[in-house]
């Protein structure tokens, strides 16, 4: 297909997505793109990125977070919260385990038992009255 061999970049599977920029840099993809677009740019400094990748690969703690909401049965309903928690975990050197708890199933009698293993609780906002009582019970729980 008339692509010069030196312009073929391998995109191997990586254990963690954060390893991809380093893999592409090691194949000089940045230089190829800059050259093709006739752009002069300084060399990439990857020290901080490499440190992040190393941290992500060597997390040595776990945090259990209870996410109490009314849309927990929908996989992507709290995607931005999930990703924010994962990234916060990187900062504190921890794998974050999220326990999705349906707020409609919480009440004053079961909330302490349901949240007892949580290191933290997040109650994302929602619309309407459905599940609000369980959210409030979670917020007020001091087990």
Give the positions of each predicted feature:
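N-terminal beta1-alpha1 cap of cysteine-dependent amidohydrolase-like domains
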Residues: 1-143
